[in-house]
Amino acid sequence: MKARNLCLILICVSCFSTKLFAQSPGPVVQWNHDLVSLLRTPGAQPATIHPTRSMAILHAAIYDAVNSIDRSHAAYKVLLPGAPADASVDAAAAAAGHEVLLNLFPAFQPFVDGEYQQLLTQIPDGAPKIEGVQVGTAVADQIIQIRTGDGSGVTPPVFIPINVPGDYQLTPPNFAAAVFTHWPNVTPFALFSASQFRPDPPPALTSQTYTNDFNEVKTLGPPRSPAATSDQQLIGVFWNGAIQNYWNEIAQTAALSKQLTTAQAARLFALLNLSLADTVIAFYDAKYTYTFWRPVTAIRAADMDDNPDTQPDPNFLPETKTTAADPSYPGAHGAISAAGAAVLASFFGTDQFSFNLTSEVFAGVQRSFTSFSGASQEAFVSRIYAGQHFRFDQTAGAQLGNNVAGFVVTNLLH
């Protein structure tokens, strides 16, 4: 039975991995694509481990492996002494990715080994290839060791709601337990602390900001709202997936379009995923500091908020039917998308980039953008249209994501 289940899982990964690149993507983009595919596979990773941790470890290892040979920028954590200057950076990237993914996803060794062998066949045999593999493996082992005991593996404490207006309650219809309650205590990859850029508290329930944003999500956020345009309804559902996956796929498209070298791609994906990982740690710090209620709770219980300008709807559900199982403030999509757009615009020296993006939840449905910030802004408002967040959640999230990304690109991998 175990073997049968593993076979089914590997088939599922293969289904997610069928994207065909118009050109050889190189080891950095290929491993990124493979990791996104793994993370979309049910059961591939413990539900208590946030996917951005895996992404950051993978790309930190690849970057430091390549940079140990290339030495064009500062190391993230590891600058392997004595790495031959003529070693193959492609082999180093391939080996580093292989070592990390085997460590993080041991049940998927056949898939990971197969991808690794395909990458190695694209590299000429000889001493540079052998040396590159040695560098990549050694650096990856050190990065893995550095992240051991980072707090991600502890048992998440159970969140016990307090029945006070404004305080987070488990949400209908499933009333699932709050997730990632331990993530505020995970060691950041770059920040000094999880609270380094903690936003100010959410607005008071009787404030004009709260009133405006409450009524906005109440109006636009329910299923098939007559007040929402068909495009707003589509946007609300289009982005209702794992937002970090979208930004890694945008980076894949940009890296291939700009024909980045292996060293350039390694740096891009490291900056991106170190930023995203720390943004997640930072927003969970804020979420569990303020424990602010979700719109579905607020709208159903508006008769308890002492605000005469908010009216209850005891049957309200969001466009997406269910609500993410964590406090509302700050918003994750706003935070991650702002961080992703900021890193990409900084790396390429421009916000302008035309690309298509395929939805994770609407098979084959694409939307087109002409800038990174355009995609970020659409992801921001999508959570209002989806009935998931207040606008002030997303505003605070976007500021947090910008702050984290700014810190990373200013201080790391120069």
Model-derived regions, located:
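Acidic/polar surface patches and capping/hinge elements
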Residues: 23-414
